[in-house]
Structures are given as structure tokens and as C-alpha cells.
Swiss-Prot record:
UniProt region (C-terminal), positions on chain: 772-869
Organism: Staphylococcus aureus (strain MW2)
Protein name, UniProt field: Chaperone protein ClpB
Region of interest (NBD2), residue spans: 559-771
Annotated stretches, region: NBD1: 158-339
Coiled coil: 390-524
Length: 869
């Protein structure tokens, strides 16, 4: 018995048989151990053939186990179990060897073991009974005229069924969504497939534009017989490259599998069209030391026209892998698949609408489809139509479906209230005092009312759920009937087609309309319903907002109020800069109302003014107002960009340089948060060439990073701050704080000397911040003290500062050329430091209020006023 003359599957079965013998404490390897191991082998051909012959495999395996248990086990020390082969097991191998010679094979394979077992083993004979000829016929079909010339012959049997899926068969079974449009690309593909040689189209396009859908569309046309005669009998197989590579343990096994697939395709005489998605993976697939990769194995067959192949890949991967191998590239004909426009996407969504309605059991409004196409095109810029629009619709449907499965909020609240009252009732029943009895009586009345309300709501919910279930069932029946009609028309079953088209389908459509009308009449408007089963444009807007962070959904009342009073909110934080606050808040309101220019940022402003007047503070307060956190502000300190080459930090290092994979500080931040406030602080400190990057952002609302990706800035507010002309402002401002026209001109002259005209011309507004007045300082004192009180609140301590003390603080710290920053430092010295010393020295108890007053010597006094009990 030469183990090298056996296939890997037979070798593995013998190894398993040794382990079985050891488990049963048998010195010999019995025939049943070998056959049981063969039956339990993963992807067992032995088992597969018996199953196809309708033999009870589980019972046969149990019979092998029972027979093994009848052999006498040997106990003792130093006994080597499973070291010898029994006489009957030896006969099995010898007979299998004779079958190997009969089949003209080079290795003993599983089918030889099965034929041998049918002749020698009584248990196998009993179960196979009179199916010997059937099994012989199945073995013949499985082998398909092949000979066992390798130790892994199983890969050659039904290779296409193992490593691919029949798209034409899936269309016939109704498993595939309809393909709408793409007629020109499908026709182009058909034209290339009809050539004599090099009849291999490769579909090239961005991810998500519908390359795979074109092949599915071809499969659907083949089923409908809507193709030229030369393609009528064709079938399309999608090759699963990962399945080909997976589990290839031995050298050359991958090549063997691929050869088996290609052989089947070749033997079909052009009937099989092979579709390889992500065809670039073929280049280098399976390549080890000295081995040939899959791409090179395909070349001869592709050139001779023996292999009909459709490939699909993206532009980048085609350039990176296929174009490098010019011999492989010339064997394919390119078909460019462009991204459909919004109108075509809406048509595609309308075609898919019914499938999604049936699958999710919801109703999709047409305006939801239009919104999905338009909003995805406008806001989801890093993906492609129609894929991103289909994803939006699918997600919105899933959201509504999830809501339908749970209780509505109104019923949920009543259920919680009833539970709460029942708990209180059971507690009060144990009390005997009059107050508890009185409360119990009131509570029982309230509980009765709530339970009545609960029953009414529950009944209404059940009724709506039942009606929705009926609608879903009717839609599913209609979908099945339409699928059956397509099958009947394809198979030329005219009688059945006529019955479905003129009888069943119109009747189902009528019943569905009646159900929908009744549901509409009974429930009234959508807003009156307990359960929503309609997907509207609002749901689509919500999903876009979830994905991008950009507020697209309709304004709720609280947000509407917040926007209308945005300037008031900003005024509370930014003192004395009315014009700047109004300009920024107006830009946000325009954007949220949906009337801003869709191709530019929400707003781009240059804030000019002395230090400490609120330029940066306005940007921070805007971020806090819009996003409830200053963290949503992208702050870039332009003093870090003083060198010319520093621009690469904004958009990313060029290819070949360290940090290329990390992307740019600005571009990556905006890609992650497309709706944000960008603050470019102290812009005059940056090198002038850095501003050239800003030209496209300010004008077109986009910027291309170092990797060639376009980053969308259309939903950002860009604020630049600068101190240019601050000296002119300080010297020439009126006592009232107003900026004169001559001062404004002088500042603009300074500005033009520094910035190029093309930068200034693209700004929405250049805002001059006026120096702070003494009145503004007293308001800022209040702000600083409020923030101090918030910090003290954590320690349950509060501070009260008298008006005299506040006025003194504002006056003493007033330095027009430095703005509000000296005031902050002055408050730290005069209030925070003495207070901190007192807290450490005396340790105030919780609830302490400290009063700060100004004495006659113009010094602040601290008094511990009261302690709250």
C-alpha cells in the first residue's frame, strides 16, 4: 500500500481512521473506521455521491459506528493502537487500486474507495441495496470524463458550481433586483462579446456607479431573450476569486482550481461567459516563488477567444494593475461606466421602489426618492450615484421598519405610567393610615383611567398593525405574480401569462388600491397615525444628517427659535461687535433656510481689528451655538505656516514624502466633519503662498488634497482673523466707538499691501472690529465673573461682586490697544488669587457665598456672607 499513490482526501481519511481506532482502543484499522472517516471528511465526495443517490448517510454512518463498537478493544500498557491494517481494510485498498487502473487514473481517489466498499463491505452493500447502477452513473457525471492525474482531483469536479454563481439562473429564480437604464453600456458589452477574438469587455468606473449592475442587466436580457441570436443560449457565471484562493494549502492547488474552471468554460464551446468582479485581483493572485499568477494563465485563452470574460474594476485599480501588464490589457476592450446624473438616479430608484417596499413592508413616497437622489448628490461628496442614493432609501426604509416593530411613544409612555401607578398601589395597600387610604383611592381612580387609555391605544395600535400586515401581504403577492408573469413570458407559456396579466395581477392591484384607500380614510392624515409605514423626504433628510453631520432635515421648533435668535445668543458672548455678529448669524440663517449658493461655503469672513476685541471669541461662540460645543471648530494657527513649504501640512504631503498617508490637517478635519466652523487664526503670520490654497475653497467650495481626493467645503463657515491695520483703528476711532470712512480706507490700504486682490475679492465680507470702549469693559467683567461662578459651583461656593467693584475692575484694566485680555489677567490677580488663598487657608464649607466689595482705599475686600443650611 503506497500512500503516495493516494489523493489528499484518501490520505486524510486514513489518518482519521487511525484516530478512530485509537479512540476505540483497536490494534487494527478496520474497514468501518476507513469508511466512517471517508464519510465525515470535510467536503466529502464519498458523502456527496451517496446523498445524490438518496441514501440515508446519517444512518449509514451510525451503522459503521455500531460495527466498530462490536470489535474487541485491547487494554494494557505500551499497546500501539491503529498501527496495523486489518485484512478486510487491506482488501478495500487493493480493490480500490484495481478500480484506479480501470478508470485509467494515477491516484486512488474517493470514488474508487466507494466502488470498492460497494463490492467488499457488507454494511455498505446493505444500505446501497439496488442503487449500484445509479451510483455508477453519478460517479460518471461527477468525473465528467476527467482522469485523476493529481492528488487533489476534487477541485476539478463541478469547479464552476464550486467557485462561481450562475447569474442567469438567479434571474430566473427572481433573486435579482431589476436593472434600470445603462442601455448604451449593455449594448456596448454585447457588441464586444459578439466579436470573434478578444471578445472580452472590461467595465471601468468609479465604485458604486453600477458596473456589476450592467452584467446583471445582461443576464436579465438573456433570460428575456432580448439579446442577439449569438448570445441567446449563453449563461453568465460570476467567478468568486476569494473562494478559489481560500483553503489552497498545497503548492499549485490554486492553479489547479483555476485550470479546472477554465477547462469547464472552454468545454462549454463559448456557452459560458465568465464574469470576474474586481478583475485586478487576478494580477498576482496565487503567485508564489516561481509560480505563474492567474493573469498569465488567462492570457492565451483570452487571446484565442476560447474564454468569454467580462471584467469589472475601478479606474485607479485598472491603472495600477491592468495597464502595467500591457499584454493582459490588450486582450480586454474597455467599456467606460460613468456616474449617472440625478435624473437617471431618480429613474433607477423608481424602478427599485417596489422591491424595497415589499422587502421592508413600507410605502415609499416619490418625493423621498427625489430627495435621496438630490441630497446624496449635494451632501455625500465622497461616494457615487446611484449607490449612495440607494443606500439612503434602504436605510430610511429600515428605520421605518424598526419603528413599526416597536410600540409608539404615546403607548410606551402610558405603559410606563400604568406600571408606576401599579407599583405605588401595591405599596399603599400595606399602609393603614388615613392619608395612605385617601391616596390609594385617588390612585385607583387614576389607574383605572390610565388603563382605559392604555386599552384604547393598544387596540388602535393592533388595528393599524393588522391593516399594515394585510397591505404587506398583498404587495408581496403582487410582486410574486409579476415575477411569475415574467417567467411565463420567458418560457412561452402564453396561457399562464394571459391569466396572470389580465386576471390575477389586475385583481391584486385593485385589492391593494382598495386596502390603501380604506387605510387612508380610516386613519386620516399620516400625522394622526400611531404607526408610520411611509418613508418621506424627512426620513431621507434625517439619514443624510446622521451620515454627514450637516443639518438637512426640516427645522424643529426649538431649532427655529435658536436660529432666529442666533445674533442675540452671540451678542451675549461677544461684546461691542454688532456688525460682525449680524453678518455671521445672517450667513448661517441663509444656509439653514436652503437659499445659499450651493457651490460656495456658507460664509467666508476676514475679521480685522486690534488684539483682544473678540475676533476669535466670535468664531468660538458660533461653533458653541451651532454644535453645542466649541470642539466642533477646526482651529488652525496660521503662525505655524510661516514657511512656503508648510502648505503641505494643510493638504497633505506630496507622494514620496513622509506623512503622505496621513493626509492634511485641514482636508482630513473637513472630510470627517463637513459641517463646521474653520478658524484660520492670525492669517497675516502665514507665508503669502499659503493663501493660494484658499482660492478654490472660497470660490468653488472645494479643495483637492495630496491624494487627489476632492474635499467639500460647501458646508463650512470660514473665518480668518488678522491684526493688519489695528494701529490705524486704535489711533483714529471716534469716542463713540464708530469707525470713520477714512479709517476704513486706511485699513483697506494696509490690507491690499499684504493680501492679493484675488483673495480679498473672494471673501463674503471683510469685518472691522472696533476697539473696546469703557462701557464694553463692564459687560466683559460680568462675563468673566459668571464663568468664575460656574467653576466655583463645582465646590458648592458662589461669589457676589458689588457694582462698584465691577466698575473699578473695568476701569483699572482698561487698555484700548490690548482689548479684553488685560482685564482677564487683572481679575485673576485681584479676585481669583486672593480667593484661592482663602479657600486653601480656611476651607469654606458647601453653600458659602463670598461677597466682594470696594473699600475707600480702592482695594477689594472679601467677606464670607452666609452659609446655606
Amino acid at each position: 500500500m503506497d500512500i503516495n499513490k493516494m489523493t489528499y482526501a484518501v490520505q486524510s481519511a486514513l489518518q482519521q481512521a487511525v484516530e478512530l481506532s485509537q479512540q476505540h482502543k483497536l490494534q487494527n484499522i478496520e474497514i468501518e473506521a476507513i469508511l466512517s472517516a471517508a464519510l465525515n471528511e470535510s467536503e466529502s465526495l464519498y458523502k456527496s455521491i451517496l446523498e445524490r443517490a438518496n441514501i440515508e448517510v446519517d444512518q449509514l454512518n451510525k451503522a459503521y459506528e455500531d460495527k466498530l463498537n462490536t470489535y474487541a478493544s485491547v487494554e494494557g500498557d505500551n499497546i500501539q493502537y491503529g498501527q496495523y491494517i486489518s485484512q478486510q481494510a487491506n482488501q478495500l485498498i487493493t480493490k480500490a487500486e484495481s478500480y484506479m487502473k480501470e478508470y485509467e487514473d494515477e491516484y486512488i481517489s474517493m470514488e474508487h474507495i466507494l466502488r470498492s466498499a460497494m463490492d467488499i463491505d457488507q454494511t455498505t452493500k446493505h444500505y446501497i441495496n439496488n442503487k449500484v447502477e445509479v451510483i455508477k452513473e453519478i460517479i460518471k457525471k461527477v468525473r465528467g470524463g476527467n482522469h485523476v492525474t493529481s492528488q487533489n482531483p476534487e477541485v476539478n469536479y463541478k469547479a464552476l458550481a464550486k467557485y462561481g454563481r450562475d447569474l442567469v439562473e438567479e434571474v430566473r429564480q427572481g433573486k435579482m433586483d431589476p436593472v434600470i437604464g445603462r442601455d448604451e453600456e449593455i449594448r456596448n458589452t454585447i457588441r464586444i462579446l459578439s466579436r470573434k477574438t478578444k471578445n472580452n469587455p472590461v467595465l471601468i468606473g468609479e465604485p458604486g456607479v453600477g458596473k456589476t449592475a450592467i452584467v446583471e442587466g445582461l443576464a436579465q436580457r438573456i433570460v428575456k431573450k432580448d439579446v442577439p441570436e449569438s448570445l441567446l443560449d449563453k449563461t453568465v457565471f460570476e467567478l468568486d476569486l476569494s473562494a478559489l484562493v481560500a483553503g489552497a494549502k498545497y503548492r499549485g492547488e490554486f492553479e489547479e482550481r483555476l485550470k479546472a474552471v477554465l477547462k469547464e468554460v472552454k468545454e462549454s464551446d463559448g456557452r459560458i461567459i465568465l464574469f470576474i468582479d474586481e478583475i485586478h485581483m487576478l494580477v498576482g493572485a496565487g503567485k508564489t516563488d516561481g509560480a505563474m499568477d492567474a493573469g498569465n494563465m488567462l492570457k492565451p485563452m483570452l487571446a484565442r477567444g476560447e474564454l468569454h470574460c467580462i471584467g469589472a474594476t475601478t479606474l485607479n485599480e485598472y491603472r495600477e494593475y491592468i495597464e502595467k501588464d500591457s499584454a493582459l490589457e490588450r486582450r480586454f476592450q474597455k467599456v467606460a461606466v460613468s456616474e449617472p446624473d440625478v435624473e437617471d438616479t431618480i429613474s433607477i430608484l423608481r424602478g427599485l421602489k417596489e422591491r424595497y417596499e415589499v422587502y421592508h413592508g413600507v410605502r415609499i413616497q416619490d418625493r423621498a426618492l427625489v430627495a435621496a437622489a438630490e441630497l446624496s448628490d449635494r451632501y455625500i461628496t465622497d461616494r457615487f450615484l446611484p449607490d449612495k442614493a440607494i443606500d439612503l432609501v434602504d436605510q430610511a426604509c429600515a428605520t421605518i421598519r424598526t419603528e413599526m416593530g416597536s410600540n409608539p411613544t404615546e403607548l410606551d409612555q402610558v405603559n410606563r405610567r400604568v406600571m408606576q401607578l401599579e407599583i405605588e398601589e401595591s405599596a399603599l395597600k400595606n399602609e393603614s393610615d388615613n392619608a395612605s387610604k385617601q391616596r390609594l383611592q385617588e390612585l385607583q381612580e387614576e389607574l383605572a383611567n390610565e388603563k382605559e387609555k392604555q386599552a384604547a391605544l393598544q387596540s388602535r395600535v393592533e388595528s393599524e398593525k393588522e391593516k399594515i400586515a394585510n397591505l404587506q401581504e398583498k404587495r408581496a403577492q403582487l410582486d410574486e405574480s409579476r415575477q411569475a408573469l415574467e417567467d411565463a413570458q420567458t418560457n412561452n407559456n402564453l396561457e399562464k401569462a394571459a391569466e396572470l396579466q389580465y386576471g390575477t395581477i389586475p385583481q391584486l392591484e385593485k385589492e391593494l388600491r382598495e386596502l390603501e384607500d380604506n387605510f387612508q380614510d380610516e386613519q386620516g392624515e399620516d400625522t394622526d397615525r400611531m404607526i408610520r409605514e411611509v418613508v418621506t423626504d424627512e426620513e431621507i433628510g434625517d439619514i443624510v444628517s446622521q451620515w454627514t453631520g450637516i443639518p438637512v432635515s426640516k427645522l424643529v421648533e426649538t431649532e427655529r427659535e435658536k436660529l432666529l435668535h442666533l445674533s442675540d445668543i452671540l451678542h451675549k458672548r461677544v461684546v461691542g461687535q454688532d456688525k460682525a455678529v449680524d453678518l455671521v448669524s445672517d450667513a448661517v440663517v441663509r444656509a439653514r433656510a436652503g437659499i445659499k449658493d450651493p457651490n460656495r461655503p456658507i460664509g467666508s469672513f476676514l475679521f480685522l481689528g486690534p488684539t483682544g476685541v473678540g475676533k476669535t471669541e466670535l468664531a468660538k461662540s458660533l461653533a458653541a451655538s451651532l454644535f453645542d460645543s466649541e470642539k466642533h471648530m477646526i482651529r488652525i494657527d496660521m503662525s505655524e505656516y510661516m514657511e512656503k513649504h508648510a502648505v503641505s501640512r494643510l493638504i497633505g504631503a506630496p507622494p514620496g514624502y513622509i506623512g503622505h498617508d496621513e493626509g492634511g490637517q485641514l482636508t482630513e478635519a473637513v472630510r470627517r466633519n463637513p459641517y463646521s466652523v474653520i478658524l484660520l487664526d492670525e492669517v497675516e503670520k502665514a507665508h503669502t503662498d499659503v493663501f493660494n490654497v484658499l482660492l478654490q475653497i472660497l470660490d468653488e467650495g472645494r479643495l483637492t488634497d495630496s491624494k487627489g481626493r476632492s474635499v467639500d467645503f460647501k458646508n463650512t463657515i470660514i473665518i480668518m482673523t488678522s491684526n493688519i491695520g489695528s494701529q490705524v483703528l486704535l489711533e483714529n476711532v471716534k469716542e463713540t466707538g464708530e469707525i470713520t470712512e477714512s479709517t476704513e480706507k486706511a485699513v483697506m490700504t494696509s490690507l491690499n499691501a499684504y493680501f492679493k486682490p484675488e483673495i480679498l475679492n473672494r471673501m463674503d465680507d471683510i469685518v472691522l472690529f472696533k476697539p473696546l470702549s469703557i462701557d464694553d469693559m463692564s459687560m466683559i467683567v460680568d462675563k468673566i465673573l459668571t464663568q468664575l461662578n460656574i467653576r466655583l459651583l463645582e465646590q458648592r461656593i458662589s461669589i457676589e461682586v458689588s457694582d462698584d467693584a465691577k466698575a473699578w475692575l473695568g476701569q483699572e484694566a482698561y487698555e484700548p490697544q490690548y482689548g479684553a485680555r488685560p482685564l482677564k489677567r487683572f481679575v485673576q490677580r485681584q479676585i481669583e488669587t486672593p480667593l484661592a488663598r482663602m479657600m486653601i487657608k480656611e476651607g469654606f464649607p458647601e453653600g458659602t457665598t463670598i461677597k466682594v466689595n470696594l473699600n475707600s482705599d480702592n482695594n477689594l475686600t472679601f467677606n464670607v456672607e452666609k452659609i446655606h443650611e
